[in-house]
């Protein structure tokens, strides 16, 4: 978990997190009540705008702060026991412990390599650059995304004096060094009087959907199930929605006095797999649409999106979809 990476959590997922996992300290998250989307084809003109006067749209949290809080709360929980697994651990030794269910989130261990290699995947040939801007104090509750010729850049507030940056840059035809990225951040800066730009980190971008969610009593989970482009801020939200469904299935089985076995995992796959695939493909379609738009010289596509954004019913639908996913 990089110190300059952040995640966005939708309002409904945030409420679930506080109720079922742990209370996130008010010092660790920042409220976002407005989202503005631009394209550099229509200079300084808002392409799409999402806001809810009654509620926050989502919350921004630093990855490392969330991980630190999660570890602290797990240690205090009577339901949690930390085990250090040996390097030579294998499936046979796990079976001897007779676990009802095994949930695997590690894409690099022996379980993943044996059972969870078949997936539908796509390489975006993008590098996501992340950093944090230190800037002059302003009212800072609006997230901004700009679709540039190099790729989408998101400005995600984390306080009145700090804003997280995620710049997904197309590197298929051109490579960028850190000074290029910093120049482009400054060029696309929507409103901030920048005092300092922290060290840049980067990671490759791809999307994937696992073909089979479980084998026997072993469930793949998290990024193993699905990875999506970060432009919509939905990766972690998809995982929390999966968690909500899995917890509900397990709670229902326990309440009925039923055994926790592979039937739990089968029900989970049936309730989530198709929806996750459709949702991830929708995010991919958004990326490819803007990717196509930047290659076309006229502004017609951008103007069509602007007209769609001005439709109140569609606007509200997209807000709900980003909050709760596909129901």
Where are these predicted regions, by residue range?
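A general structural signal for well-ordered alpha-helical segments in protein cores
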Residues: 14, 63-67, 71, 126, ...
